[in-house]
Amino acid sequence: TPRSATTTRIAPSGSKSDVAIVGAGPGGLASAMLLAASGVKVTVYEAAPVIGGRTSRITLEVERGRAFHFDRGPTFFLMPYVLEEIFAAAGKRLQDYADLTRLDPMYRLLLGRPGKDPLVVDTTQDIERMGAQLDAIERGAGAQFRKFIADNRVKLDRMTPLLRRPIRKFTDLIAKDAMKCAPILAPHKSVHDLLGKYFDDPLVKIALTFQSKYLGMSPMECPSLFTILPFIEYEYGIWHPRGGCNALMRAMADACEEMGVTIRTGAPVERISFAGQRATGVVVDGETIAHEHVVVNADAAWAMKNLIPESLRRSQDSDANLDAKRYSCSTYML
């Protein structure tokens, strides 16, 4: 299982550090929870008038006391144990702040066929039932689906230590646990290529590769590493948070505020202040606010160009190099 070795509560460090966090999206709020649990003074600055970042929501009031809420970003939730670990580390329980429902079926796929009605697949964590639906499309696909799940269980298990720590230098990539991943990553193959190892029917491949679009990528271009995405759905399920995914942001914000975190919405950070190469605070509405440390939870390229002076960046992070890069879009779905 990719769960971490421990979910014990973070012990207060006794530190009197003062930390600014740029952005009240899920990463910023998670950072705030963990830092506050260790005893650090935390202030979160969010440019928008509401929390959530790309997991914010739109509210349409229809009459007094009644309104409709629409998630602006994700609409379903994966791997809830990760958020459970964050809450546990802060000495709290996710179930005290949010209500999650496991979906079964997870979603319905309509697989189009020229001149025919689409094939309907109701995806489920019941591997035998899911395999039977795939067998109806391609003989033997059920057994291959079970092999696909087993292989990706090994892949994610080996990759988890790597995914849970920063890669700061080349030697991090040749550490023992990183090298254990090398034989199973197949970096020269795409998600679509790797599915060809298991299935022949293009509709079965579509059913298990469209998840790469969550990353804004085509299955034909997406690195084969990301076959873990459909595996994660079938292994851990798809969940609906009552109130939408933004309700999870509210849950995290509530936990933060209980621990003394200050969350300032409508407070766009214009730039980070520096003394030499050390961040010393943030500039908001023309005011420089001192902090000992700054955590940035914003798009990396945007933050580099807008928050950090070019003179302090590495050459590969110059404005010209950042402008020359290709960036994937997110997925727009109705």
Locations of the language-model features?
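Glycine-rich loop(s) and the adjacent beta-strand/alpha-helix scaffold that form part
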Residues: 238-251, 255-259, 272-273, 287-334
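A conserved short coil-to-beta-strand element within the FAD-binding core of flavoproteins
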Residues: 265-279
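Rossmann-like flavin
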Residues: 112-223
